[in-house]
């Protein structure tokens, strides 16, 4: 009689609450079996499992912060250079577009493209918006907020992406 040895309850996947990479923003990277079948992955390959906390930290999901003084967007775009990125402000929205043509990588040829659109708060000073790309591929879009009653100046314009040589100081969630 064969008896299946199960992992302790605290090492098993958490079912629908287990973070999957399926909707992460790893533009063009491959999917693994646990991305598509998180319930079965521990039974198919019980000795290989990505850490729950590492998955959450490396998820690549953009983060938007809006506090009293400023508005900031952090977006992981590690596969793109500043020349591949376009950041535009149109009315109350910021649009971030990244595209690079087909290039060769370790497994063949790949091309990537993404679009993100975020609503700007009405009190963000659009004349002082800035955008930078850190050495580790974190795009930071930020703008100061103005006191209520002051015109924030809404117009359509492109925001240049500057390159920083130091790694990002973005939150690690």
UniProtKB/Swiss-Prot annotation:
Cite a single GO MF annotation: unfolded protein binding
In this UniProt entry, the residues modified to Deamidated asparagine are 101, 123
The Deamidated glutamine modification is found at 6, 50, 90
Location of the region described as Required for complex formation with BFSP1 and BFSP2 in the Swiss-Prot/TrEMBL record: 1-63
Which keywords does the record carry? Acetylation, Chaperone, Cytoplasm, Eye lens protein, Glycoprotein, Metal-binding, Methylation, Nucleus, Phosphoprotein, Zinc
From the UniProt entry, list the residue stretches annotated as the region Disordered: 144-173
Tell me, in one coarse class, where this protein mainly resides. Answer: cytoplasm
List every position bearing N-acetylmethionine: 1
- Carbohydrate attachment sites? 162
**Record localization:** Cytoplasm; Nucleus
Q: Which residues bind Zn(2+) 2?
A: 107
Q: Which residues form the sHSP domain?
A: 52-162
Q: Where is the composition biased (Basic and acidic residues)?
A: 153-167
Biological process (GO) annotations held by this record are:
actin filament organization; apoptotic process involved in morphogenesis; embryonic camera-type eye morphogenesis; lens fiber cell morphogenesis; microtubule-based process; mitochondrion organization; negative regulation of apoptotic process; negative regulation of gene expression
Q: Name one Pfam family in it.
A: HSP20
Q: Which residues carry this modification: N6-acetyllysine?
A: 70, 99
Per UniProt, Zn(2+) 3 binds at 154
GO CC entries? cytoplasm; cytosol; nucleoplasm; nucleus; protein-containing complex
Q: Into which family does the record put it? A: Belongs to the small heat shock protein (HSP20) family.
What does this gene product do? Answer: Contributes to the transparency and refractive index of the lens. Acts as a chaperone, preventing aggregation of various proteins under a wide range of stress conditions. Required for the correct formation of lens intermediate filaments as part of a complex composed of BFSP1, BFSP2 and CRYAA.
The name under which this protein is listed is Alpha-crystallin A chain
Q: What is the lineage of its organism?
A: Eukaryota, Metazoa, Chordata, Craniata, Vertebrata
